[in-house]
Structure formats: C-alpha cells, structure tokens
Regions:
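Active-site mouth loops of central-metabolism enzymes
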Residues: 128-142, 190-191, 195-196, 240
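Structured beta-strand/loop patches that form or line metal/cofactor-binding pockets in enzymes
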Residues: 1-45, 49-53, 326-327
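Flexible C-terminal active-site loop/helix
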Residues: 4-15, 29-31, 295-350
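Conserved, mostly hydrophobic/aromatic
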Residues: 3, 34, 41, 70, ...
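Metal- or metallocofactor-binding catalytic centers and their adjacent structured scaffolds
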Residues: 5-7, 37-114
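Catalytic core of soluble alpha/beta enzymes
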Residues: 160, 167-301, 327-338
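Glycine-rich phosphate/pyrophosphate-binding beta-alpha loops
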Residues: 48-56, 130, 134-138, 294
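N-terminal small/glycine-rich loop or linker at the start of catalytic domains
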Residues: 113-136
Length: 350
C-alpha cells in the first residue's frame, strides 16, 4: 500500500462558550485536517490545532509544513515502512510539532486500516477512560456555578483554570469547593500564571484550608524549570509539568532533575503518538505518572490521544474534554457522561 497524496482542509468551529485561561480566551478553533491517500483507496486522517501562545505554531505554517517537506517525504512510500515514515516526518523540518502530530496521527490511521485493527489494539491495550472537564477562569461565583453544572452532568473530576489574577485564585477555588460534593476531585491549571514565590504562597494556603487539590499544572513560566522545582520542593501538593515539556528529551531532563512530580503529554507539543509513547515510557522508568491532554482541538486529534491513553500503562490522568466545547463536530469522539468512547479506528465511530 503506497502513499499517493497528502491533502489539507482547514475549517473553523465555534465554541459553545468562551474558553478562558491565564494565557488566552478562545471563542473558535481552526482545525487543520490532514488526509493521507493511498493506491488502495485507504485514507488516513489526522488533525492539528494552531496554538501559537504555547507551541509557536500558526495555521499557515502548519499547512505549509505539511504540504511542503512532510508531503515530499511521504509520496510514493509504502506504509509497510511505517516506523521509518514516522521518523522521516520528525526529521523533515525543525520545530512544527503540531504539523508533525497531524501527519503522525494520519499515518497511524493508515497503518491501522492496513492491519485491520483499531489504534488502541495496535498500541496494545484498552482501559476505560473518564475525562475531567475544564472550568474556565472567571469570577468566583461564575466558576462555582459552572462547576456545579458539570458535576450534575456526571463529571467527577474538574480541571480548574487559575493564574490570571492571583489574589482571586483562592477565592475561586474555595467557591468551587463549596459548591460541589466533597468527593469531587479538583485539579488546577495555572497556565504559567504565577511566579515561584507567589505559587508557593497560594498553594500552601490552599493546603492550610484543606481544599484537597489533586495536583497543580504548570504554576510558573514554561522556561523557569528551576522555579518549577522550587515550587515542587516547597509544597505538599503534586506539581505537574505541562508547557515545560515538549519532547522525550525534555521528559528525561525533568525526571532526572526532579523538576516535577507529574508530566502532561499533548500530541500538539510533542509531535505525535510515537513521541508521546516515548515520553510516557521515560516517565515510567522514573516512577513519574503521566496525564494526557490536548489543546482546544478537534475530535480527529483528541480521539488519537484517547487511544494512546487507553493503551499505555503509565497514563493515569485524562484531560480530553476539548470536543465537548465545540458547537459541531461532524466526526470523531463520543462521550457517555465523563466516559470517553473509543472508536474502531482513529476517525470512525463504533
């Protein structure tokens, strides 16, 4: 089965409500969908999301990388050389992790169809996945109301966005904790919004108030690894690296240096399933648990993350709610409350 063409389609999808973090406010996404065509009529699908504030990738650049160097190294190649093709994509250009992720996902889809197995089976596992759901940063009473609504819909784990205004963050979390049942799990994401001393002060106060926070993502700037370690070493609540980790190389440095307690893996940061698996493996050797998440992106890419999460034994936490924010999504994932339903392939419903 040989690859005959690589095509791209760009589409915009509105969100039900604005998605607000310490870094940005999102009202719509632009999905860059990738289609790898073969001489046997099989078409593999993948997708990328432009998130320049995190990855540095813009939609035009993603499209150009896919239709330029990545397409060139795939045309005429046989899918039986699957592992080599994945490597060629990573070596085709510097950076561009989102474009690489989209093509990586599409290659996996072609290969799964060639082997007639779903992605989770190809990767070697299928555990049940329940996602958290995000509460955007806002006024405390608005966040508390939103949190209560999510719990009423069956979500037991809430991911709370903080970091936009430190003096309000304690009030936000306390309002949410008081509005939901005690057994509701709360995890926080500061999206780089605090400095190291500010983070320690806020987290210690949360601990003193017994707010029972499961873990806190990226409290400080992505490049402030020393600050990340400082926070980790001065609080009891586990600290998760997110924007600080893009690659398996980053993962190795973080676990060797003890910079974080946990790692958050995203395909748009690391460049695809292959590199994500390597990150989870490296973390596992150091006894560091991983979460998988996504940017604000479409079902085509998030469903690939779900299959990865179902298969890898060191992925323990799941943040896969992005498609639930979209007003319309013609194909991809389905949910039963917080449960993520895995499809028979990356791009089709079961």
């Amino acid at each position: 089965m040989k690859i005959t063409d690589v095509k791209v389609n760009r589409r915009r999808v509105n969100l039900h409500t604005p998605f607000k973090t310490a870094l940005r406010t999102v009202t719509e996404i632009e999905s860059i969908d990738v289609y790898i065509h073969t001489d046997e009529g099989v078409i593999g699908k993948g997708a990328a999301a432009a998130t320049p504030v995190i990855t540095g990738d813009f939609a035009n650049g993603i499209e150009e990388a896919i239709l330029g160097p990545m397409r060139s190294c795939l045309i005429g190649q046989d899918i039986i050389q699957f592992q080599q093709l994945l490597q060629h994509i990573q070596m085709s250009c510097i950076g561009n992790p989102s474009a690489k992720a989209a093509v990586d996902i599409a290659l996996y889809d072609v290969y799964c169809q060639h082997q007639n197995v779903p992605l989770y089976a190809l990767l070697g596992g299928k555990k049940e996945i329940h996602t958290d759901i995000t509460v955007s940063v806002d006024e405390p009473f608005i966040m508390a109301k939103e949190a209560k609504q999510h719990v009423e819909k069956g979500f037991q784990t809430l991911k709370i966005k903080v970091g936009k205004s430190a003096h309000l963050d304690l009030e936000r979390i306390e309002a949410i904790r008081n509005s939901v049942p005690k057994n509701t799990t709360l995890r926080l994401d500061a999206n780089q919004g605090w400095n190291r001393k500010e983070a320690v002060t806020i987290i210690k106060e949360m601990e003193n108030r017994n707010l029972n926070i499961e873990f806190i993502e990226q409290p400080v700037h992505a490049k402030d690894w020393d600050g990340l370690k400082y926070v980790k070493d001065h609080v009891q609540t586990p600290i998760m690296a997110d924007e600080s980790i893009f690659s398996a190389s980053d993962a190795l440095k973080i676990v060797q240096g003890g910079y974080a307690d946990l790692l958050n893996i995203k395909l748009m940061k690391c460049g695809g399933i292959r590199e994500a698996w390597r990150i989870a493996d490296i973390a596992e050797t150091a006894g560091v648990k991983c979460m998988v998440g996504s940017m604000m992106e479409s079902s085509l890419s998030v469903s690939a993350v779900a299959h990865l999460a179902a298969a890898h034994p060191n992925i323990h936490y799941f943040d896969l709610d992005a498609p639930l924010w979209l007003m319309e999504e013609p194909e991809g994932m389905t949910y039963s409350g917080s449960k993520v339903n895995l499809q028979s392939t990356v791009n089709s419903k079961s």
